[in-house]
Amino acid sequence: MNKENIKNLEAEFNQLPAKSVGKMDIKNLKEMANKSPRKRYRICLHNSTNHPTQEMIICLKYFNYLRPHRHPSRVSESYHLIEGALDVYLFDQKGEVKDIFKLAAPDFINQENRSLLYRLSNSIFHLVIPRTEWTIYHEVATGPFNKDISVEYANFAPPEDCDPKEAVEYCKKITNNNIHLL
């Protein structure tokens, strides 16, 4: 299956003038993530990649490798946890970990000194590592989104379509062998 087909199985764009997200939407997100090849799915609350605000509800099942990347300095992004927990690793240019943000939904908030919300306003390489069976978060980023311009992948990390064992080994290395679920 080519990358474009996988992408179509992992996202939907909202075409309504107003949209709310409730319990049934979360249930549907999980069902769609379960069906997708990479066990992830997103509802884009914006109607296209051209919208000036890119706003998504993202669902990840289990460990999911989201290659370290950064955005141009004009782009800021934030994550707000809805369910589960995740860690965001920030890197320097060489791939050395410079900071770790531990995030969790309200039901996990007292565990391991986790926060609800994270925001990145600089062009810094970052990696998201899900920490629970289901990780669901609200992401907001400056648009419009053009993958060739809006995302620069880190050369120091394996590509997203690498052998899954290679992704696991890389994440074990940067997390000191801790990619286990909470």
Regions flagged by a language model, labelled:
Residues 74-94:
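Glycine- and acidic-residue-biased ligand/ion/polar-headgroup-sensing regions
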Residues 94-102, 107-112, 127, 131-182:
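Double-stranded beta-helix
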Residues 71-72, 80, 130-133:
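Short glycine/proline-enriched turns and hinge-like loops at secondary-structure junctions
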Residues 57-75:
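Conserved short histidine dyad/triad with adjacent acidic residue
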Residues 1-53, 100-109, 169-182:
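A short, N-terminal "cap"/entry segment at the start of jelly-roll beta-barrel domains
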Residues 61, 81, 121-123, 131:
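A short, compositionally biased micro-patch
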Residues 57-59, 78, 117-119:
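Conserved hydrophobic/aromatic beta-strand scaffold that supports enzyme active sites
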Residues 65-67, 87, 107-128, 145:
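Histidine-centered metal-chelating micro-motifs
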